[in-house]
Amino acid sequence: MRSSADTRACGSGMSRRSFVTAAGVFGAGAVLAGCAKKDDTASSSALELDENGMSNQSLSTEPFAYDSVVWGGCHVNCGSRCPLKLYVKDGTVVRVSTDVDGSDDFKPGGIYQMRSCLRGRSNRQRIYNETRIQKPLKRVKGTKRGEGKYEEISWDQAISEIAEIMKDVKEEYGNDAFYIQYGTGQLGGTVSKSWAPDVTALARMMNCWGGYLRHYCDYSTGQITWELPLFNGDAWSNNEVTDLVNSKNIVLWGNNPANTRMSGSAMVWLITWVKENNPDANIVVIDPHLSDTAIGVGTQWVPVRPGTDPALVAGMLHYLHTEGRLDESFIREKFIGFYSDTFVDDVKQGEPTSNAFMGFDADGTLSIDEDMSYEAYLMGAGTYRGTGEKTPEWASSICGVPADTIRWLADLYMDGPTATIQGWGPQRHANGGNVTRSIAMIATLTGNVGISGGGTGAREGTGGVPYKIPANLPNFADRNSVETCISFFDWYQAIEDYTVMDDRTWGVRTIDATGATTYARKPGDIKLKAPIKFIWNYASNVMLNQHADVNDCLRIFNLPDEKDSGLRCVVTHDIYLTPTAMISDYILPATTSYEETDIIKGGTAWTGFACCESPAIDPMFECKPIYEVCRLVAAELGVEEDFTEGRTQEDWVEWLWEQGKEAGDDIGATFEEFKEKGLWKQTDEHTPAIAKPEAIKTPSGKYEVFSKQAYNLSKQWDLTCGGVIPDDGYDQITGLPVWYVAKEAYGDDAAMKDYPFQLIGHHTKSRTHSSYGNVAWLESVHPQQLWIN
């Protein structure tokens, strides 16, 4: 049991015991999915505070006193955005409540409540957490990154020394040696946001000074972003969730919103609403583990071995194809690569016509004259002769789903409309690109795309009525002189040995001011020009937490600073002493969202909101917001006027609000009134959007079951990454979304012999990535646990 000192350190107005008691009343899942609606009207009863200004009251309907109420928001990366109501007494946040304005029922033209889950409501434990960084810190000279030995320094010293290092790096390597790390610890704001890195205050500051090395894609969607478009040209579009009331069947494929998007403004409340309003729908959850979503809303749970989804889909399609259930004329008109008799002509249509597509074959040497169609794959013919038919029984032996269940699933897709909503877990495997393509393929081949009640097989579309307030400050991307970019995942290689990194080995691309990336005209044309020497790490715990093989990363962080490898400097600006902060050379204390001014936006279904966040409390300790840090550095670099344009952070917030009004936001208030009210909502009566692909953005303009882009890449790319990775045959790029044996996955007999259990990760309720991972209340209700089948 944690000590009372631990509880006090969290700045709570509710004790851990009271929180756990609430969990016992509602059930842990219910508590973390959102408490019942209550009247949060305050009374004049006195609130007792201890010597630290902490409340001693528990969670209850007892009256409590406060001086002021301030609107804020939850800024973590859960995929939704919720407003929060902060009650302040004597300069201390004593209670965090939620939105209770409007109805809890979704309907066109209705204003509904966007209630925060208990992660959001536990934010006092984040504000007053004992792990908060209080002063600027500098790594002690002679110590290694990761040892955790730091000395306190002044802000003046920190800014001066950081700026001098930046000047030295630029003089020696140019702007190519600077990198802004991926970080999602501060999402949803405008001025304060940490993601996407290219629209942050850091990006604006760096672009004022010549730019930095950018990256493409992100840790959430590393494979679906680029591989799903190989099939349908679009990684994101799907029917709006409220259209699920028109579905006969709903398939949540690797999608667990009860954990990942569990607030009142997110998917879990929407799918609960759908279940209530469409009670006869079959809700099938395909997932390796029995998730809270499967238990809470599912009518059928289909456990599948991780990474074997392409085999499951192949078994379904073999059954439908051999039974004559598929619409042949529809497939021949809208798809290429499915049937054997047209395959060679099909792939000519799918040839990339320019380097706007991956796998552009400038010399025209990668033609195909043999049958590599999906039909051949299913039947064990053509190139796949000798591999056997991909019957449901074959699929069952791989994916673990009984053959009769595979047939039942296939029938479900033919007896639609059937909606498919794919989470982002399935694509987080070595063969994740084929997984994500195959899931979308079964939805599309069975005629469930472009219709009400159907869906594309991508992530859900949540709708909303967005305000037109810009999502970020102008970032001056046109001033960025660095023309190359790398994958979000490959920064570590650019530290150790950038010389092996080009388009063919590590996927290096060119990038323009809009963020659009272009592929090489010929393999090997695009090369990285410099090592990463300086990293800005804001609100990010990627480098020693979310990233893979962190032990090897620690080795890379401590490489000597030499001409072509090794870091010169890592600067972390964060709220907490995270593992990533502890490998930094300078650690700068950041304000929470509740100590600065900003705007957040959000919404779902028929409601949208804009929230003007005002500081609930003064900045604690010596903490500064990212805008102020960038201003100070910009001043040292001689670009302060360019960076600020003479505006403070609050001035920028007002400017953004004015831009929204000019773009058509009908708020009907002055900025002071906007700030005073805090939370604004709007609604409409739109019909739920249906994803209707009028123009499919593939080379052929059709759905590409066989991707010539992928096939060409398999011939052009060096899958050893320039000799860095062993040529062991595990890594593959395939034209068809087929199942193959991936390293340390099911079917890898060498690994399974010694390690019969396969370890996978899944999101828990108690945290979002590592955000909220230091909140004692949440951990006590939902501790980190290992599940085993």
Predicted segment positions?
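A cross-kingdom feature strongest in bacterial/archaeal respiratory oxidoreductases
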Residues: G11, V70-W71, K89, A177, ...
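Acidic/polar loop patches that form or flank catalytic/metal-binding clefts of enzymes
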Residues: R95, R214, L326-F330, T405-R407, ...
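Long, C-terminal catalytic modules of enzymes
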Residues: E622-K675
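N-terminal export/assembly segments and adjacent metallocofactor-ligating motifs
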Residues: R2-L326, E333, G350-P352, A356, ...
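A glycine-rich, hydrophobic/aromatic-adjacent loop/helix-cap motif
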Residues: T387, E393, D404, L409, ...
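A glycine-rich phosphate-binding loop feature that marks nucleotide/adenosyl-phosphate handling sites
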Residues: G183-T184, K334-F335, L412, G455-P466, ...
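Long, well-ordered, tryptophan-enriched scaffold segments
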Residues: N277, H289-D415
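Conserved short loop/turn motifs at secondary-structure junctions
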Residues: Q181-V191, A395-I398, G423-N431, T462-G464, ...
